[in-house]
From Swiss-Prot:
This is KsdD-like steroid dehydrogenase MT0809. It is an enzyme of class 1 (oxidoreductase). It holds the Pfam family FAD_binding_2. Pathway: Lipid metabolism; steroid biosynthesis.
Length: 566
């Protein structure tokens, strides 16, 4: 996606940049930064957007995303028979977040405000700007605990028609041909300028030009220095998911041992640099030990960035086994509790788990996260989408991983499957009898219409929802049924993704100091601010909330900065 708005070249020498003036500087050209820039430009202010990557990377992580949005009591939900409400969504959010620290004051305020937004103007505000929504609503993070615990009580995951690129383009279009908006790509901020207890600008390094494709690592060779001044600086630079050193440094003790093997769900430039830079300028950083990493990562056979992993978005039917071949405990079923599963895995002493399933399940229940893995949705090709769903066999991108992925094995018998699993590199040899016992016990539970097995009960409950029955969840059946074969196993890795803590802000996205007062002139939005306040999600997320958090906090930052400048 190329910008056609007024755009600086990728490398502008410091002397050439000195004459540029702006009312506000936005650090980061991802979704939160673009939304903030739109709000500033709409109010007639001059905006300079700085980013360390080239113009191919405008939109940041949002461009790569599935485009999922958390909406409450939407027309899409109601058409599918889902009865949602603000009260139910807030109950789910607070039960999931489990705020329990003194520093959670502002994150909890943001949580209330965000649920208000999701249940109120979020859909209409985005629709007015061009958002189109796929009609089926997904059910992510189903929980499985009590009514006040973690999880979505109802489906709320709304997919942008066109996925991440279409969502990014909504705000890119607003910035096109605006003479008051300038981009400075390959400009890496190294320092926030603080004068008289206020942030008044930025200093940094001009990096050599890069023509690397989106997401690929780029050079950090310096070709100059820069300094820009403005009345407001908005930090919207993303989290730490591409920086495994920082992920490990901030790994929470409650989550067990630090994984030795990690895949990256985000490009290397998601490095978290600006969190430390803002902290040095006086910003309070809270909840750095809260993070969101997926447990269903698979190695990308065609990587774009280092250790590139793709997340499986699973339906609920696969049998989930740990590295020793033992079934994960209730309610750690596919798609129910990401962080609970992560904690179990890290405390097991291993960094991987297994899905055991069959062709019938993978055909309907495997989706891959990311716009590039969903060409029908991303390309807004309805005919292709309908054909792929009606066609026998898995969607094309899933089939490609079955054929080429290093983490997939298949066989006609369970004994042959376990033997193939044991042939994969870096695995603890599985005992066939242990795996067979788990599979056999599970298969006995599908003979009747009732069951004591929590996963089978959850599958049947899911199929009462039309969206799941039609397009997401297969009818319970024996994994070893020859008609559903062949059997398939997938080795699953831990995949880095989101930073849930970050720079502390008030509801106007003003950055706060350790004493709780605003650091004048500085604002933060998106993942660098924990998607709002320094951690709007608390310990866990409900999904569809990360893009929405960037939009909501970016909007707040743009409006807050504009108000203060005026």
């Amino acid at each position: 996606m190329a910008l056609t708005c007024t755009d600086m070249s990728d490398a502008v020498a410091g002397s050439d940049a000195e004459g540029l003036t702006a009312d506000a500087i936005v650090v980061g050209a991802g979704l939160a930064g673009l939304v903030a820039a739109c709000e500033l430009a709409d109010r007639g202010l001059r905006v300079l957007i700085l980013d360390q990557e080239n113009r191919a990377n405008v939109g940041g992580q949002a461009f790569w995303s599935f485009g999922g949005l958390f909406l409450v009591n939407s027309p899409e939900q109601r058409r599918l028979g889902i009865r949602d409400s603000h009260e139910l969504a807030l109950q789910d959010w607070l039960g999931t977040a489990a705020f329990d620290r003194p520093e959670d004051y502002w994150p909890e305020q943001w949580a209330h405000a965000y649920v208000d937004f999701a249940a109120g103007e979020k859909r209409s505000w985005l629709r007015a700007r061009g958002l189109k929504i796929f009609p089926l609503v997904g059910w992510a993070e189903r929980g499985g605990y009590d009514a006040q615990g973690h999880g979505n009580s109802v489906p709320r995951f709304h997919i942008t028609w066109g996925t991440g690129p279409a969502l990014v383009d909504i705000f890119v279009r607003q910035l096109r041909d605006r003479p008051t908006v300038r981009f400075a790509h390959r400009h890496q901020v190294d320092k926030l300028i603080v004068e008289g207890n206020a942030v008044t600008g930025v200093r940094g390094t001009v990096l050599e030009p890069s023509d690397e494709p989106r997401g690929a690592p780029s050079s950090r060779k310096s070709v100059g220095k820069f300094e820009f001044r403005a009345s407001a600086v908005i930090v919207a630079s993303g989290g730490i998911g591409g920086n495994h050193e920082l992920v490990r440094k901030n790994w929470p003790r409650r989550m067990g041992r630090i994984p030795k093997q990690l895949l990256s769900g985000v490009p290397a430039h998601v490095d978290g640099r600006m969190i430390g830079i803002a902290q040095k300028a006086g910003a309070a950083v809270i909840n750095p030990d809260r993070m969101w990493h997926y447990t269903e990562g698979i190695t990308n056979y065609d990587p774009i960035w280092p250790r590139h992993g793709i997340r499986i978005i699973p339906g609920p039917s696969s049998l989930w086994l740990d590295a020793a071949g033992k079934r994960l405990p209730v309610p750690l079923f596919p798609g129910f509790d990401t962080l609970g599963t992560l904690e179990y895995i890290t405390k097991s002493g291993h960094d991987y788990t297994w899905f055991v399933l069959n062709a019938k399940i993978i055909e309907k229940e495997f989706a891959l996260s990311g716009q590039e893995q969903n060409p029908d949705l991303t390309g807004r090709r309805l005919g292709q989408l309908l054909r792929s769903r009606a066609h026998a066999g898995p969607p094309g991108p899933v089939q490609a991983f079955i054929d080429r992925g290093v983490d997939f094995v298949h066989a006609n018998s369970l004994r042959e499957l376990v033997a193939a699993m044991n042939e994969l590199p870096d695995v603890v040899p599985l005992d066939y009898e242990t795996v067979a016992a788990a599979v056999t016990a599970r298969d006995r539970e599908v003979v009747n219409k009732y069951s004591k097995d929590g996963q089978i009960t959850a599958i049947r409950a899911a199929r009462r929802y039309r969206g799941d029955r039609f397009g997401r969840v297969v009818a319970p059946h024996r994994l070893t049924d020859p008609k559903a074969g062949p059997l398939i196993a997938v080795k699953l890795h831990i995949l880095t993704r989101k930073t849930l803590g970050g720079i502390e802000t008030d509801l106007d996205a003003r950055v706060l100091k350790a004493d709780g007062t605003p650091l004048a002139g500085l604002y933060a939005a998106g993942e660098v601010a924990g998607f709002g306040g320094g951690g709007v999600h608390g310990y866990r997320a409900l999904e569809g909330t990360f893009l929405g958090g960037c939009i909501f906090s970016g909007r707040a930052a743009g409006r807050g900065a504009a108000e203060d400048i005026r």
